[in-house]
Design a protein with these regions (language model features):
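Alpha-helical subdomain
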Residues: 1-70, 156, 165-331
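Conserved Class I S-adenosyl-L-methionine-dependent methyltransferase catalytic core
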Residues: 8-27, 32-38, 47, 53-160
Length: 331
């Protein structure tokens, strides 16, 4: 290896240190302890129940990263960081941080997952109530901006009834119904997830317009869901499962759609010939996090839609930076 190549590789090998630093700071609730104040090492050590020695090193590292401002013997949190990592902030992304940390633990088994071709201990989100709630919270923190972008792009003025498949915190239903007050929606997801869905629906005052249906999309032979939907959104569901399971799912869902109804698939589509780093990494994350999931191409998902009898299948560009939307119509 050349001398020029080693420094770059070394930087990649050490990249985990910055993420572990952030995970530790969040676990110790450092940003909430700081709030809008400027505190000393000793004050923060008491608040976090930590040693002054360790706290000083942690705070200096956070300052070196540019997340804190150090002046004399006091540390303060930058305003933009405080908004994201303080528990009292309505904009906080703490559930997302915890989800990413959980993912980092799964990635430590990457070599084993590559050997066996699937993830290890992948069912925790389904059965662990605390982990599921954190996951759903993260989906809302990450997804609401995407939901708003979809609501702004599509014209739903002639649509009345939305089926939000695997809707989690109902972010997409909420964003669409906020923009189109004549519409109503149904969120279909796992029973444990639906408990969290109902909390988000109530938080946004949508109880009279959004209902919920508990369903296991990949295991239930038939869905206890009414027909009569003229728009259906399948957002960030298909990457969780294998090709055969997804084909069967699309076929069952298409039967719930009215003639002329629109099916929107929101996914992290991948170009196998030239995948971006982000999509290649996310597909690999699905290897460690699921039994058979991965990112799929436009062509693969398009084949499932066509096999289910849908037509006018086409990608939608310009909403997101990377390929993310595919639309089809039921004839």
């Amino acid at each position: 290896m050349t001398a020029a190549g080693w420094p770059g590789l070394l930087g990649r090998l050490r990249a985990y240190q910055e993420s572990e630093l952030l995970f530790a700071a969040v676990e110790l609730d450092m940003f909430t302890h700081l709030g809008d104040a400027a505190c000393t090492v000793e004050e923060l050590a008491v608040l976090a129940g930590a040693s002054t020695r360790g706290m000083r090193m942690l705070l200096d590292a956070l300052s070196a990263m540019g997340l804190l401002v150090k002046q004399d013997d006091r540390y303060a949190c930058r305003q933009e960081i405080s908004a994201l990592l303080t528990c009292h902030s309505p904009e906080n992304k703490l559930n997302a941080v915890r989800l990413i940390r959980h993912g980092s633990e799964q990635w430590r088994k990457l070599a084993e997952c590559v050997r066996q071709g699937s993830g290890i201990d992948t069912g925790r989100f389904v059965h662990d109530a605390e982990l599921n709630r954190s996951f759903i919270g993260a989906m809302h923190e990450i997804g609401f901006a995407n939901a708003s972008a979809i609501a702004a792009h599509f014209d739903f003025s002639s649509r009345k009834r939305l089926l939000d498949v695997g809707g989690g915190p109902a972010s997409y239903s909420i964003a669409i119904l906020q923009r189109y007050p004549h519409m109503c929606a149904t969120v279909a997801d796992l029973p444990l997830t639906i408990e969290a869905s109902q909390e988000y629906i109530a938080r946004y005052g949508m109880q009279n317009r959004i209902d919920t249906v508990p369903v296991d999309l990949y295991r239930d032979a038939a869905f206890d869901i009414d027909t009569g939907y003229d728009v259906m959104l399948i957002s960030n569901v298909l990457h969780m499962a294998g090709s055969e399971e997804n084909g069967a799912l699309i076929d069952k869902l298409a039967q719930l759609l009215d003639a002329g109804g629109m099916m929107i698939v929101h996914e992290s589509f991948i170009d196998y010939a030239a995948p971006t780093v982000e999509r290649a990494m996310f597909s690999l994350h699905m290897l460690v996090a699921t039994d058979g999931g991965q990112c799929y191409s436009y062509g693969e998902v398009g084949e499932w839609l066509a096999a289910a009898g849908l037509r006018d299948i086409c990608p939608v560009e310009g909403v997101f930076e990377q390929p993310s939307l595919l639309v089809a119509v039921k004839p």
